[in-house]
Amino acid sequence: MKSEKVAESNNFFAVRDLNPVSEGHTLVIPKKHFVTLLDIPNKLGEEMLKFTKKVAGDLLDEKLGDGFNVIMNNLEVAGQLVMHAHIHVIPRKEGDGIRFFYKA
């Protein structure tokens, strides 16, 4: 099954998650292979954050949420299921019922 590509740059692309937590749940993925955040060179990491900001802004512009979470799971113990670095951008709405394992 293919996922819908929603954005692309020279080094990254963004696709809708195949098992979304919320409508518009999007993954930001580097085109080059890295396993975790620690493997991504600093300059590319900065570019990844800028690209993630663009994706998050687009989700809000599309009215898919009133806020968003940005999450990156690194290694299996932290919930990483695919061993290719990626960032989850999860649109949120008031009362959506989504709960994470920690308290802010």
List each language-model region with its residue ranges.
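HIT superfamily nucleotide-processing domains
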Residues: 1-104
